[in-house]
Amino acid sequence: FKDLRKDPKWSFVKLNPNNQFAEEVAEKKPISELATVGIYFFKSGIDFIEASLEMIKNDDRVNNEFYTCPVYNYLIKKNKKIGIYEIDINEMHGIGTPDDLLKYNDLMDFPKSRDQPT
């Protein structure tokens, strides 16, 4: 989705000049207006595992944590074609932060649990 505010809570993708495939991805660092929703698909499980292991071996962390999105950079370096499916920002609801989850719960009119602040 396009995040015109470029909120650094998301992952971002920069497309190649033809706007066909990902040229680079970044976690928590806006490199374009295209943010990801945190749902990833890997055509090959072994590609995911090998790229993940390489990321871990390189200690490629963000905020001292490993994330899934940067795995794609390792696949891009191997000339793998990484595509995106763009959705409208109004068709997704982030739930990656406590505030996002509370907003989503309010939107869906879910009852508040005892553990949630009121």
Q: Which residue ranges define each predicted feature?
A:
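Conserved core of the sugar-phosphate nucleotidyltransferase
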Residues: 1-59
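Conserved alpha/beta core of the MobA/IspD/sugar-nucleotide pyrophosphorylase nucleotidyltransferase superfamily
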Residues: 34-118
